């Protein structure tokens, strides 16, 4: 959200923070009629992502659903096949700038091959085939904006359940690295 133009009206739904079940999420998605729904996940999340994205698409068929994260980056073509028909597009690699370019270039919902071909790291379907654009690495990771605290205020998160000192402060997990932080060996 931080990389998107400020003119974009962005909502962040954190199901854990808001103690939201799937039924509440689907109702909110249907009621708010989002233009774009962004999901992210690891390889372990791919089955729940497929199931959720299919339900999201049924509740909000006009919404464009995109998927990023480690799973989409490791196996983009297989991921696109697996999450069909719920997910419309995937992003591989560093998605911040690519997502911003996607939003800017498709505001008028022009998803022509020529428009999509110019978006780095985008994976999409064209004429029955899956197309993967080359990724564009972010040369300076310090250029990535900090999170949009206005749409995810730290005080809105529950207090940490861990540690004697930290129990009095709100807690939300945030990754400060690229890629997967876990030491598994089955993905890569």
Predicted regions and their residues:
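Glycine-rich beta-alpha loop elements in corrinoid/cobalamin-binding modules
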Residues: 3-140
């Amino acid at each position: 959200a931080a990389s998107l133009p400020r003119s974009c009206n962005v909502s962040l739904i954190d199901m854990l923070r808001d103690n939201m079940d799937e039924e509440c999420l689907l109702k909110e998605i249907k009621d708010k009629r989002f233009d774009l729904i962004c999901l992210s996940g690891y390889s372990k999340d791919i089955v729940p992502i497929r199931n959720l994205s299919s339900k999201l698409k049924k509740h909000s068929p006009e919404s464009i659903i995109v998927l990023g994260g480690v799973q989409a980056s490791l196996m983009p073509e297989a991921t696109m096949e697996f999450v069909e028909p719920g997910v419309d597009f995937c992003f591989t690699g560093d998605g911040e700038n690519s997502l911003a370019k996607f939003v800017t270039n498709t505001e008028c919902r022009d998803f022509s091959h020529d428009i999509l071909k110019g978006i780095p790291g985008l994976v999409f379907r064209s004429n029955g085939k899956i197309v993967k654009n080359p990724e564009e690495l972010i040369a300076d990771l310090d250029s990535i904006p900090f999170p949009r605290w206005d749409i995810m205020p730290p005080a809105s998160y529950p207090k940490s359940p861990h540690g004697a000192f930290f129990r009095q402060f709100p807690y939300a997990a945030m990754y400060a690295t690229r890629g997967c932080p876990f030491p598994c060996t089955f993905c890569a």
